[in-house]
Structure formats: structure tokens, C-alpha cells
Amino acid sequence: MIIETIIGNIQTLPSLPPHIERVYMASDDLVKRIQRVVTDHGRELGIRLKEAKELADGDVLWMDDHNAIVVSVLPEDLLVIKPVSLKQMGEIAHQIGNRHLPAQFEEGEMLVQYDYLVEELLQQLAIPYKREKRKVKQAFRHIGHRHD
């Protein structure tokens, strides 16, 4: 089966069929328009999205009256950073930016993929954080550039 469009997301669709198969994906795979995946029931799918749209947790790839195939993002090893002041936020944002590390922001938290050097920096700067496994809503985007 070849999937070319995303039907919707389980958060916004009015109803779902009684049985759901899941395609477990790492967040890095959410940005790939063309890939081969296997559901938790062993069904092979080819994904070849016509639009340049990223996949997201809960996206419905296929559905009929009895079944749906849904994307489920695997939890990632993250540093969840909770600065307590604007100064702390500025310090850590500057340091993470200098390292060209992608970050995401959710409800007052900064999320970065686990890196022992960033963890050491957080400890040195006494910025509150915790390490945890968590699903992210979108892929971390690495934006490359060069310094001239």
C-alpha cells in the first residue's frame, strides 16, 4: 500500500474506526516525505507524500470503516529546561544557539535532545532542568549555516 496523503489527525477527526494499527516513528523520520514503514501488525506501507508536509503524532495515514493506520512518535531522550528568570533563559538560549542545537518550546519549557555537554552546562549555570523520555510534537530541525 502506498500512502500519498494524510487523512487527518486523531485529535481533530470526528470519529475513528474501532481498530487502530500504529506506525512507530522516531521524530527525525517525521520530515521524510518518502519512506517505507511497518505497522505494529506487520503491514508494510510505502509513504510518498505529494505535499511537502511533515508527519505528526496522531496523523491518520489510512482509514476504512473497521481500521485506521496512525503515526505514533517514539519518545525521545530530552533535556527539559525550565529557566526561572529572563537572564537564565537568555544565557541558555545563547549557549544552545552557539552550538547550533535545535530547541522546541512547550508550556514554559525548552526541550533539547539529550547532550551530556548541555547537561554539564545547565549544572554549571544552575538552571533547573530534568532529563526525561517524552514524545515531541514535531521533528527537531537542524539548521546549518556557516560563519564567514
From Swiss-Prot:
Highest rank taxon of the organism: Bacteria
* Keyword Chaperone part of the UniProt annotation: yes
Q: Cellular component per GO?
A: cytoplasm
| Single Gene Ontology MF annotation | nickel cation binding
Q: Which UniProt keywords apply?
A: Chaperone, Cytoplasm, Nickel, Nickel insertion
Q: Where in the cell is it found?
A: Cytoplasm
Biological processes per GO annotation: protein folding; protein-containing complex assembly; urea metabolic process
Question: Which Pfam families does the protein's record reference?
Answer: UreE_C (PF05194), UreE_N (PF02814)
Name the NCBIfam families for this protein: PRK13261.2-1 (NF009755)
**Which family does the record claim for this protein?**
Belongs to the UreE family.
User: Could you tell me what this protein does?
Assistant: Involved in urease metallocenter assembly. Binds nickel. Probably functions as a nickel donor during metallocenter assembly.
How is this protein named in the record? Urease accessory protein UreE
